[in-house]
Curated annotation (Swiss-Prot):
Pfam family, one: BASP1
Location of this chain's protein in the cell: Cytoplasm, Cytoskeleton
Gene behind this protein: BASP1
Biological function: May play a specific role in the development of tissues.
Species of origin: Gallus gallus
Protein name: Brain acid soluble protein 1 homolog
Keyword annotations of the record: Cytoplasm, Cytoskeleton, Developmental protein, Lipoprotein, Myristate, Phosphoprotein
Keyword Transferase: no
Bias-annotated ranges (Basic residues): 1-11
Family under the similarity heading: Belongs to the BASP1 family.
Modified residues (Phosphoserine): S6
Amino acid sequence: MGGKLSKKKKGYSVNDEKAKDKDKKAEGAATEEEETPKEAEDAQQTTETTEVKENNKEEKVEKDAQVSANKTEEKEGEKEKTVTQEEAQKAEPEKSEAVVDAKVEPQKNNEQAPKQEEPAAASAPAASSEAPKTSEPSSDAKASQPSEATAPSKADDKSKEEGEAKKTEAPATPAAQETKSEVAPASDSKPSSSEAAPSSKETVAATAAPSSTAKASDPSAPPEEAKPSEAPATNSDQTIAVQD
């Protein structure tokens, strides 16, 4: 019995050692398996980090490239702006030169216009100088008409009142002659002024003649008082000559 027990103990011991070896082997395999996933995870992490780093580097490179491209674009844009500004500055002097040329041309046209106006002005005074010449005969005719109107007054022996009335009428006619002689040079129609003047004088003579015939009843009219009516006629001739 005792031997059996010892054998059993020995057997147990042997079995225990084998079991222990098996356990150790199993544990080793388990540890190896555990280590291999850890190593794999570490490798994956390292690869991921390297990939991330590479990606970051690529991103940085891309960013740098973009930044450099943006900088170059900005520089090109600035250059284009400077070029456009220079072109605009060049275009402005050209515009100013064109404006100056346009201003010079109207000035030339304006200078030519006064030159054209000068001959016209010269011809106008010539016409005006001819107009007074034509007005002179009319003024002489006007001066002769009052003298003719005074002739019947001498023959009829007018009264003193008639002489005074003629004195007042005679100065009025020289004034009318002066105004008409002044109007005649300004007007371009030469015959119309000369024709209108005699007609107006004829009306004045006609109005003076009835008054003289009506007042001819007084025979005591000295001839000396009728003579002052002739003096204004001569004065009118002098004034017309001065105006000419």
